[in-house]
Amino acid sequence: MSVYRTLDEGEFRDLASRILYEDNHLLVFSKRAGEIVQGDKTGDEPLSETLKAFVAQRDAKPGQVFMGVTHRLDRPVSGIVLFAKTSKALERMNAMFREGSVHKTYWALCCAKPSPESALLTDWMTRNEKMNKSFIVKGPGGEAKEAKLKYTYLRSTERYHLVEVELLTGRHHQIRCQLAHIGCPIKGDLKYGAPRSNPDGGISLHARSIRFVHPVKKTEVFLEAPVPTSWKGV
C-alpha cells in the first residue's frame, strides 16, 4: 500500500499532461501560478509532495519516492520547474545551479514597453523579510546584493508588452523588482506597481525555457513550457 495519498483520475491526468521531460534521474514539470514548489508556512501541499504521490501511483511503488527540489519559482509565477529523482542527480543539479551552468529564460508581460528595447540591468537589491518584498538601493553596503539580468523586448499585444529575461543572478523577486524599477511592472503584480491584479491571483511572469547538460547522461537538454492559456494574444 502506498504511503502517499491517492489522486483522482482528473488530477492524475492533469499532472501527467504537464510533465515536460522525465527519465530515471530528473522530472521537469510545468507549474501553474498559485502552486508552490516546496512546503511553506501556509501548509498547502507543494508540488514536490504531489509529484511523489503521482509517481507512486503511476509506477505502483509501495515505498518512498524521492523528489528533490533543485530550484524554486515564486507562488504567483508559472513555468518550468526541475526536480531530481535521485540524491545523486539532486547533488549534481544543485552544483550546476550554483556554478551558473543552468540557463533559464523567463517571459514577462509588462504594463509598459521598455526603453531601450534590450539592455543589461545591474542594480543593488535588499530584501525586507517582513514585507516579503525587495528594493533597489543606490549601491553596495549593508545587506545589499548585486542583481543582474538581460532583457529583450519581443512584441506587444493591445495593452501589454512581452519581454524575455535572462537571469544572471538569483535574487529574491529579482525580475519583478528590476523591471518595475525601469517603469515596466509585470501584469498582475500589485506588490511592484501593477495597477490591477490577475483573475487567478498570479502574475504574468513565466519560466519559459531551461537549458543544461544532463547530470548523468551528459547530453544537452533544452525544454520550453507553454505559456498559460490566460495569456491571450501572446
Residue ranges and their predicted role:
Residues 1-234:
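RNA pseudouridine synthases
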